[in-house]
Amino acid sequence: MAIKTLGAKAAAALDQELMSTGAFSIDQLMELAGLAVSQAVYRLQPLESGRRILVACGPGNNGGDGLVAARHLRHYGYNPTVFYPKRSKNDLYQRLAKQLEDLDVPFVDDFSSAVSSTDHIVDAIFGFSFSGEVREPFPAVIQALQETKLPVTSVDAPSSWDIENGPPESGLGSSFMPTALVSLTAPKPLVNHFRGRHFIGGRFVTPAIASKYGFEVPEYKGIDQVVEVETTGQKL
């Protein structure tokens, strides 16, 4: 199946349509996205290969997806740690954080130190709406992500990448190539610059909505919420 992509404007319009015509709530979409991410990590990082997962969360919806993923990973038997330096005051995000606290999932302030004691990193900092410069406190985090030898799974977009054009030509993030990418709902144009393992998580989009936005819903197997698709990188 040829991969069709959605630009930032189309992706935003699709999200709005899912919450209007599709009758989904933001809570539902975030839960489904985080579940998909957790299933991708489960494939990439089997429990016997290391249970320590560091989830880096940004202040927006991408970070919310990361919080949901961390909860599911905890229930799978992993030991997630969450880096969430810019906590939102929004009730939804506060509830997601409370759910993790109730599961004794630790929140850390020092990302660099946390990297030294983890087995896999989930990059849930910036999503498809990111543009401009990376602001504090995230430049050091992006630098650590591009320097680490650990596997990194990015949620919808490798943080610092332009949604249309991929990694910056120079400077921060220019050499950041995560191990895996989980495209949510549908891949974004940046996937054309990606060279790792690629998963799609969107097992809630109706054929009618997919057709309207010009992409196909991939064939998901069994009860899977993600499907791995071919890239020029490693494939399952």
Curated annotation (Swiss-Prot):
Residues that hold K(+) according to the record: N62, D123, S159
What superkingdom does the record give?
Eukaryota
Entry protein name: NAD(P)H-hydrate epimerase
Q: Which organism is it from?
A: Fusarium vanettenii (strain ATCC MYA-4622 / CBS 123669 / FGSC 9596 / NRRL 45880 / 77-13-4)
Q: Where is the YjeF N-terminal domain?
A: 11-217
Enumerate the GO terms in the molecular function aspect.
Answer: metal ion binding; NAD(P)HX epimerase activity; nucleotide binding
Write down the chemical reaction(s) this protein catalyses.
(6R)-NADHX = (6S)-NADHX; (6R)-NADPHX = (6S)-NADPHX
The record's comment on cofactor binding reads: Binds 1 potassium ion per subunit.
Its signal peptide is none
Q: Which UniProt keywords apply?
A: Cytoplasm, Isomerase, Metal-binding, Mitochondrion, NAD, NADP, Nucleotide-binding, Potassium
Write down the EC number.
Answer: 5.1.99.6
**Binding-site residues, (6S)-NADPHX:** N61, N62, G63, G64, D65, G127, F128, S129, F130, S131, G132, E133, D156
PANTHER family for this protein: NAD(P)H-HYDRATE EPIMERASE
